């Protein structure tokens, strides 16, 4: 398949990308990968058993952002997590409680530099993060823009 000119050209073009807008996928039976048939429930179970929490461009990763290689890896056509992590700017789009693990893993892995999300997801991501690092610390979920007395 990699000998196909159009695929070869797409991969060559990917080498010149300096900004990527990507989605982060969660690994649940309700995920679009499973619903659309790109991933079977058996493959999903294999990934989860290996510690995978999310995916970007069909590249799977664990809670630390480390790649998780599945038995079907060689049948996936993707630029891969290694290449994604070398891109100068990767902005991820992900929101909702089901995506928290995928977002945290991507942030820990350092392969995204920006995140587009909703307020509730952002606040949940900041729970437990010390306030000196921009989090809410142990003060609970404050509304964005409200000052906290204490």
At which residue positions do the language-model features occur?
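Conserved phosphate- and dinucleotide-binding cores of soluble alpha/beta proteins
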Residues: 1-137, 141, 150
């Amino acid at each position: 398949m990699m000998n196909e000119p159009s695929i070869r050209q797409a991969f060559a073009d990917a080498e010149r990308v300096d900004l990527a807008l990507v989605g982060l996928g969660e690994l649940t039976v309700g995920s679009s990968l499973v619903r659309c048939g790109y991933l079977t429930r058996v493959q999903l179970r294999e990934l989860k058993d290996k510690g995978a929490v999310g995916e970007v461009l069909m590249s799977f990763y664990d809670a630390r952002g480390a790649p998780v290689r599945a038995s079907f890896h060689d049948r996936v056509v993707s630029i891969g997590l290694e290449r994604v992590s070398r891109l100068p700017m990767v902005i991820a789009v992900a929101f909702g409680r089901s995506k928290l693990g995928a977002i945290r893993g991507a942030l820990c892995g350092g392969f995204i530099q920006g995140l587009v999300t909703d307020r509730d997801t952002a606040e949940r991501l900041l729970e437990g993060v010390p306030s000196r690092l921009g989090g809410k610390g142990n003060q609970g979920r404050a509304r964005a823009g409200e000052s906290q007395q204490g």
